[in-house]
Regions:
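Acidic/histidine-rich, surface-exposed loop or edge segments in extracytoplasmic proteins
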Residues: 1-4
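Zn2+-dependent metallopeptidase catalytic core
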Residues: 7-29
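Hydrophobic (often cysteine-bearing) scaffold residues that line and stabilize catalytic clefts
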Residues: 12, 69, 73, 92
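Catalytic zinc-binding patch centered on the HExxH motif and its immediate surroundings
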Residues: 34-56
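Short pre-active-site segment immediately N-terminal to the catalytic Zn-binding motif
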Residues: 53-72, 86-88
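Catalytic glutamate of the conserved HExxH
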Residues: 71, 75-79, 83
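Post-HExxH zinc-binding segment in Zn-dependent metallohydrolases
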Residues: 88-111
Length: 111
């Protein structure tokens, strides 16, 4: 199940999830909740917290549309990594950063 608690990018978030689940079927195996929140003090655009088969993505609530797309894609890659059991932080970030812009462009070209 995929849920976005904020209204600003609900439709866009669902479109991103559909796009990413086509590439990463593992995303449909777990519950994912996206929570827009003020992450200014944390100096990040988003992060993913895992609890068993439930993943919570906190995403900064004042992102531009493009930054929202890139950040949600990045965090959904982390959810897939959680399902695959990839725990090494360096490998996780290298993979997510190496794919986020390519996948963002693919998503934008589909819209």
């Amino acid at each position: 199940m995929f849920i976005i608690t904020g209204k600003k990018f609900t439709t866009l978030g669902n479109q991103i999830f559909e796009f990413m689940s086509g590439l990463y079927p593992n995303l449909t195996e777990v519950d994912i909740e996206v929570i827009p929140t003020d992450l200014t003090e944390d100096n990040v655009f988003g992060w993913t917290l895992e609890n068993n088969d439930q993943n919570e993505i906190e995403i900064h609530n004042e992102l531009s549309q493009k930054d929202f797309i890139t950040t949600l894609i990045h965090e959904l890659i982390h959810v897939d990594q959680n399902v695959r059991g990839l725990r090494d932080d360096t490998q996780r970030e290298n993979e997510a950063y190496s794919l986020e812009h390519t996948l963002t462009n693919q998503f934008l070209n589909k819209c």
